[in-house]
Amino acid sequence: MTDLFSSPDHTLDALGLRCPEPVMMVRKTVRNMQPGETLLIIADDPATTRDIPGFCTFMEHELVAKETDGLPYRYLIRKSG
């Protein structure tokens, strides 16, 4: 099985940050990415389990993968075009 998290185009370390900081940083980072590029987000705030998927839905980006069974949480999103 391929590890989807192994080769993102960009990585955002949001460990230790609390809502709303992680999603604000994701928004700023994604804004500077090209369509089709991927972003790995590493976080430990439980609010990200709802905020990151919600951000992807609202902004129409693809939530490629998420791993929220244990800490740290990992999310891989692809910027829409």
From Swiss-Prot:
One of its GO terms (biological process) is tRNA wobble position uridine thiolation. It comes from the Bacteria. Pathway: tRNA modification. GO terms for cellular component: cytoplasm. Interacts with IscS. PANTHER family: SULFUR CARRIER PROTEIN TUSA, SULFUR CARRIER PROTEIN YEDF-RELATED. This is Sulfur carrier protein TusA. The lineage of its organism: Bacteria, Pseudomonadati, Pseudomonadota, Gammaproteobacteria, Enterobacterales.
